Amino acid sequence: MPEDVLDTYEREEPDTEPETGLATLRDPSDIGDVGTADRAGLEDGDEIGGTAHTAPGNVARSSAIMAVGTICSRVTGFVRTIVLAAAIGTQLLGDAYQVSGMVPYMVYDLLIGGLLASVFVPFLVKRRKLDADGGDRTEQRLVTLMLLGLFVITLVSVVVAEWFIRIYAGGFSGAQYDVSVILARYLVLQIFFIGASGLASAMLNARHRFGAPMWAPVVNNLVIIGVCLWFLSIAGSGSTPEDMLAHPSQLALLGLGTALGQVVQAAVLVWALASAGFRWRPRLDLRGSGLGEAAGAASWMMLYIVVAQAGALVSTNVATRAGAAAADLGYETGSGIAAYKFASMLFQLPYAIIAVSVITALLPRMSEHVAAGRRDQVRSDFSRGFRLSSVLIVPISVAMLVFAVPFCVMIYAQGSTSAADAEAIGRILMVFVVMLIPFTLFQLQMRVFYALGDTRTPALVSIPAEIAHATTAFALLWWMEPQHVVLWLPVPYGLYYVIGAIIMWGLLHRRLNGLDGHRTALVLVKLHLATVPAALLGWAMIHVFRGLPGDVWPALAAMVAGGAGGAILFVLTARILKVTEVTSFLELLKTRLRRR
């Protein structure tokens, strides 16, 4: 779908004009490193490189399998989030679980995950094409090295789990601290299986077997959903850290059950890899393998990952300290990392569903244009890609702003999460969604640099952006009452992307001889204006249906009426404002529906 829309835009609109005073650059000698198009960022589930390959055989069938798998993964992930909130809530136990659950992924990304995504996967694809044995020896060495490294890292992480909690949650104390340490020891066992899953997925993608990597997370989600429901049926709602210490079997169920989901996911992927013909034969003869040279080329990407992990460390510390302080003051609504994470998961959904698809379609196009010395076409791709993403992300972000609180009450206010807790999540989400456009712009700009073969610039840009994020985040902790800190914590988070996007815009403006800024800004303004009548209708519907009984029916009725009516108003207003991106998208959608 994104490829079709991009092609339609390319046919229907003129090429982007260079900014005033600049000439179009078409230098055949300006060749980038096409291989860097496969270097993925840090977003969850964002495996950009995988879909850039053309699968043999029935491409339509393969694409359909991947699309359905992706949708099922998102849907089951959404359900998992809802069930998890019902099981652990947003109070002290929820904060303990969230911090402990973040530790294995942070450790993995910092020590191995970044290298795997940015270096070893492109290196493996290259060796499979060039080596006489089809890259078999390289794969055997890589698997052996990775599994040994993962085993050692997992073992050490279990031993030092307490230090991870001290680092990431310095504000925890008493039973909350003890529960966090126990959960961390259970959950860091996932590190080995997270790495095995990532490696198996990469090797399957290199073999053009895309189905299993798309479907395996569904199994993980289903296991965790089952574990959370089981935990809720045994422990009941409103469990506290003290309750968990008194019932260690319930704590073991929560921790080991979560880890089991990752184990099952890894097992599915390893089985799929074996079915594809891979047989592991341990090899440690690394001399001459090229792995060291490949890893050495990742220095700038690793710098970016280190800065990103530093940002996660700052946000986690601020949120956990604020949540613990608010609880000490007797504040009953969740004000820590759990509420922040539940809002963040919803915030990233539009980007994960819409913008990631556009990025996947853009990367090979931009890389081809770089290789052909057509930076003017790279500029056109970026402009069209951002405007295409904005056509859906702008109205969705405004809808999320309007319906954030009733929607969060509808999905989260059950089990261990009270209506007041859910309302707090909704208010955090309202602050988050204001940052959705800068977040999307930053991610697209970063992929332009990767298509240009430049990992250095995004890494360097991340440093001042992270300084701004850390400074403002700690300022919130110092100056605000603890129960309000997490509400405004998305502002420092968004500031990182605002500053990063501004800096990268200026740098890309020079690299690409303009960025079609006037047209892009005009489209953004028109799109936001087109959402005003829809937003007013949405707010009106919230007030109209407020009198219905319960928490679910008022929210559901307001969202159905306001969403349907708002969508119609948005399209009509966009037509009046002559937003051609919206009309082109709708025409393409009509054409595809007629074909079916």
Regions from the PLM with identified roles:
Residues 1-596:
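Membrane-embedded alpha-helical bundles of multi-pass transporters/translocases
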